[in-house]
Amino acid sequence: MRYYSFWDRLVFCIDEALPVMQIQRCSAVTRPSPAEGLIPHESVLSKEELQLSGSLMRINHVGEICAQALYTGQALSASSKDIQKKLKKAAGEEIDHLNWCEQRIHELDTHVSYLNSFWYLNSLLIGLAAGLWGDKVSLGFLAETEHQVERHLCKHLQKLPLQDKKSRAILEKMRQEELEHALTAEHAGAVPLPLVIQWIMQSLANFMSMVAYRI
């Protein structure tokens, strides 16, 4: 098996980041959107409801960008090849979510966040730092991230207009899979993060949501 150095992995990381930071859809879509085949209901949504759905989906799109960057950063600094593989797998599985959200954003006639490059780079650095604390902490970081995303998606499902069935189908599928990712990390040996770290993570997520809602 070929050994990849830190610098090899860094080059791969930059190559994977470019489509995201240039706000282009990733090409590695492996599954159709859960909303595919559903009848659009945009015509029955008011202007305010369309704006609400678009803003919520933009937040979720940014959330997927951050998750992908976090896991890529952690994989870059992880010492165990097995953990690197798990983290890269988690990052890859977020690509579908990323594209589902972006497709829906365009259908709602709005835009992705103009700060995608900032969100990605910031999360990548956090992931790099988290990976230096060891493999079990990396898995704990993955599990906590997924649990927070799952709770966040539950709140958005409550806020979505009732008639926006396409966005709802996407978020419900994402919620199920984020929970599965968290449980997989826990079963692999993740250690719970200190409450203060959980609080900091939640505060950063709240800041991201507030900004991405508008830009």
Named regions from a protein language model:
Residues 1-215:
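Non-heme di-metal
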